[in-house]
Amino acid sequence: GEKLTAGSKVYANNRNKMLVLVQVGKKDLSEGLNILGAHIDSPRLDLKPNPLYEDSGFAMLKTHYYGGIKKFQWVTMPLALHGVVAKKDGTVVKVAIGEEAGDPVFGISDILPHLAKDQRSKNINEAFTGEDLNITFGSTPAEAGSSEGEDKDLFKKNVLNILNEKYGITEEDFQSAEIEVVPAGAARDLGIDRSMVYAYGHDDRICAYTSVRAQLDLAGEVPEKTYVTLLVDKEEIGSVGATGMQSKFFENCMAEILGLTGGYDELKMRRMLSASKMLSSDVSAGFDPNYANVHEKNNAPYFHYGPVLHKYTGSGGKSGSNDATAEYIAELRKNFDENDVRYQMAELGKVDQGGGGTVAKFVSQREVD
């Protein structure tokens, strides 16, 4: 097949959920890669395999939350549906409802304040449970038929008729669908000075976009070392599965690249990974004056002070963390300072307050800095 040379640009798509961009450099791959990495999944609600039911004059959808959500944040707000429905004939139908100006939106109801005495007596985890996050999908019945049984589940039938007319899908097709429920609406400027961005999915699409943008902006040059950008799925639930960072997709891609640039062998692959360096980018927790008690001020990131470097993340005693070496942090500091990049070193909140992790720990297992 066609060989890759310095300056060649290729990409690999893993099941439409993980992307690897590669720009081949001048140096031999055994001298290492310069890698950017971010995840493209975000906390959300997923429809269950059998989501649709009706109750008391409403057509409803059951959901199963994905990732670390605060359940109470998802009630009484406009929601949109995004995803795909894979049909038995092999076709895949894209679904997007709730983003266009004329689209309907969806929602999860809450108890009105007048009747919330019992709810107020519960702690927040008891007041809002995963099984309570049911989507109000419709409230108009279909016309009843004349035959026996045709007057049942009329609210459910009506929404199914609409879905079939618009998308050609049936109730059974939900079983092979991946439909996500997310906050409806486009990104907007936040603040009278328009200094911030109000949007769903900052975690981690803000880093995914900037990583891709960085590689595309350098597409016209031939780098010394090979550039790689990794956009991965399933970070919010542990980087698992065939499209998460724990999969073999990244290594498989680089094995193909080695094969197309002079020949694959296992030792060269190991040397390449060991000599590689990565910036694993994910969101941090900026200091919020409304919740100052969860931050330790000397080690909190602040607005206006540039991107944040975390030497480690994790929780408690750095559990579940990648702890970058002091030498690598020093190298990054030198590069940023020499290029007049403003940055800050920080931690993710107070010790024992919570914590978090990202894909770095899985990449570092390949002996990547």
What spans do the regions from the language model cover?
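N-terminal hydrophobic/helix-forming segments and targeting peptides
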Residues: G1-D369
